[in-house]
Every structure is written in structure tokens, then in C-alpha cells.
């Protein structure tokens, strides 16, 4: 059917008008501005989460030793649990008045049984701390002073001698006057840890070593009168601190950074920490975190912990089956390395002591007490030390001693009655069961898998230069 031209024109106008109305309505519903706003919100959330994650990982690695130290300081200067192993108020010493055995090791991992331990937590925010050391008449002792950044300085035979001495622990910015004959020792942070060791040469020496250890004491400068203080300190009960693995880590890091001076070269890094509320120029409030920020920081905590754990398991180059780490106590800007070391504990500077460790024999097999082993030192292979050396065996699963029939947990150059061959060489017998002939050179080992740790106190330069290595561990 054909329509008149006039009707066709009217129909086209009607259709076009309807289409125009439809498109106008569609455009009104489409509103590109709302789409742009929605996409921008997603972008902002992604940026916030990513920034929190990436900066959070850096902050966690950087702050790991600080929070480990401040948490331990709180937990060992307050009563935080029943039957607490270690407790002493700030600026006081706790003394382990016994050699370490399987029954007395407590929470110590791979402890030595050659020295008496003593420790304390210092706070010199208000004033220096006096440290008194007695005349040990040449006896080996050392005090490792560890800052919150895990950097170490030493007092002791190697560094300051064995005559009676007075020291004052001071911050780099302290500018007061010390009494006569008091030597300043500068530590980077106003809070930190003291860990001391006093050599015991045998059971008959135990009482004298304890008496010398008792003569090491601490006293704030304002109370100093040349004598140890008998002032009683009230014990304080508190909740145990454990911030690792939680957002509380960042809150504690923020509080701690506010108390510390800016380290050279770290201004830009800490400015980044400010961006997520962790740096020293802002205040961290977990309740003010946006959901994307919280998600990013929680992800950062998990990944940073995994990074630290993986870093501790990186293979250390071994020679003759012995692994020797000499990169401890001074870290600079190597934050991941610092965190990985702290994960396993705090150590002395290598000039003070080195700890070659082994879990494999010369053929690459795990050490196990079901077998017998031998370590032989030719005369020229005997450990070159200015202090002393010893060898200990620990259960592999927990780094603890295992009881044995002769209560011997280390053997070394101070062990009474060692038998050397006619050329001056030394053979150590490592086995679980008592030897049939003689026990003079016997180091009892755990029944199952175990690790060996050799301790070299005041190692000579050829050890530090890698010119000396321990002999291989021979399976018999």
C-alpha cells in the first residue's frame, strides 16, 4: 500500500521525534561522569592498597629489630607471666648463676656451657649509665652492648682489658661531664640490651667466676657513688608484648621511631613511612586506616615475615661442611640482612667471637647420633684464638643440649685432661654411647639428628681473613 506523501512525512517526523526522545533519555541514564567517578574510586583504592603494601614491607623489614628489642625489653623488665625465667628492672642486671645444662637452658637457643651469662636492659634517655667491671686478672669476659638497631659495641678483655674499670654508657648527643676515671662508651640509641659472658675454666673455678660476675654492676650517673646500689626496685606486673604479625607492629614502630634521632641517609625512607602513618612525623592509628590501607598492610606483614624467614634459610657458603657467618653486628643500610640475623638472635662482632656450625658430615650427610664421628686437628690446624675455643653438640630440632652420662656439653682447649698425639695434633671423638677405652677426648652427641657449633673467642686475623677453616667431620 502506498501512503500519501503528507502522511509519510508526518510518520517520519513521529519516528524521528521518538528516537530523539529515546536517545536523550539514554544519555541522561548513561551519565559518563558517574562512570569516571566510579573508576576513579577503584583506582584510588588500588593505589592506597599498593602504597600501604609496598611501604609496609619496607617498614616491617626496617623495624623488625626495633620491635623485637622493645618487646623483649618490656617482657624482661616487667613480670609478664608466672614462673618467668628472666626478670630485672631497667638499668639492672640479671645473672645466670649457673652454667647452662639441659635443665637450666630455659629459652636460650644453642647456649654455651663455657661461660656464665648476665644481661640487662638499659635506658639512658635521662642520664648516662655507669658500668663497673672488676679486675678479672686476665680472665676472658665480654659485654655486648646492642642498640635498638642491633648494632654492637663491646666492653671486655679484647677491647678494654681486664683491669678494674668504670664506664659510662652515653648517647651521641650527650654533652655532660663524667667523674674522673670514667670512660664514655657511645651507643646509638638511648635504649638497648647488655649481654655479658664470664669464662669458667672448670668446676673448681665456678665459685670464683661467680664472684667476679657479681662485681659487675650498673648505676645511673645521678646515683653514682663508686659503690653498687642496694636500692630496692618495685616489681611491675604487665601484659606481655608480642607485636609481630599484627598491625600493632606498625603502631609500636611509630611510637619507637618518635623517640629515636634521625640516622644519616634515612630521611627519605622515613618520609615514605610517613605516607602510611608509620614514620616519626605522624601518628599511627589503626582505627583510621581505610579498608584498602588495612588490606595492604596486612598483606605486607605476611610477605615481610616470609621474606625474613626465607632470608634466614639462604645457604651460607660452607667449607669442610662448616658454615661461618662473619657479617654480624654492623649492618648500615642492609635492612633485610639485619632482620634475618635478628630473627635467629643477636650476636657479637666477629672480632669478638665466631661460631662455625655444621649439620652435615664431610660427605654431605646429615649428622646423626646413630653414627660415630671424628674431628682431627693437625698441630697447625688447632683453632687460632687469643681467647679460647670449644665445640658443642645440640639437638637439631630445638638447638638444646641432650643429657649425657658425664655431664659434658662442650670440649675444647680448656677441657682438663685432653690427650694430644706426639706431634701435637688433637682428635675429638663424637658419639652418643660412651667410648670403650677412654672419655678424655669424648664429646657426647644427641641420639638423633644434631648440629655442631664451634666457638672461637677472640679469633686471630687469619680466621677473620678466611685463611683458617675447621677440619672436616669424618663419619666412622
Describe each PLM feature range.
Residues 29-476:
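A compositional/structural signature for long, glycine/proline-rich flexible linkers
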Residues 4-21:
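N-terminal Sec-pathway targeting helices
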Residues 1:
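Active-site-proximal segment of zinc-dependent metalloprotease catalytic domains
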Residues 23-28:
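Hydrophobic core
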